[in-house]
Amino acid sequence: MRTFALFIATALAEIVGCYLPYLWLKQGRSAWLLVPAAASLALFAWLLTLHETAAGRVYAAYGGVYIGVALLWLWIVDGIRPTAWDVAGVAVALTGMGLIMFQPR
């Protein structure tokens, strides 16, 4: 459960770090948004180091959780409800994440 929670926190840090520059570039918001964006991306990188598994495996498995969190962001922040296809894609990605992270060692 700790691994999954850490992946969720990591995904949120990455999404915020990328969303804030999007607001600046696409919606004309303040360039000052780049300061918390940089901090959020630094947090993202640091959170990835907290996993006890090899870095490549962590990055591969993290992708599955990122997809799920990104679709929640789509729904909550952007106000767009994910489709059944989106949900199926997340299920496949999370299955892959589980296979990678929780394999017998």
Swiss-Prot record:
It comes from the Bacteria. GO terms for cellular component: plasma membrane. It holds the Pfam family UPF0060. It is a multi-pass membrane protein. The keyword Membrane applies. Keywords: Cell inner membrane, Cell membrane, Membrane, Transmembrane, Transmembrane helix. It is found in: Cell inner membrane. The keyword Cell inner membrane applies. The chain crosses the membrane at residues 4-24, 30-50, 60-80, 82-102. InterPro entries: UPF0060. Its main location: membrane. Belongs to the UPF0060 family. This is UPF0060 membrane protein Ajs_1326. The lineage of its organism: Bacteria, Pseudomonadati, Pseudomonadota, Betaproteobacteria, Burkholderiales.
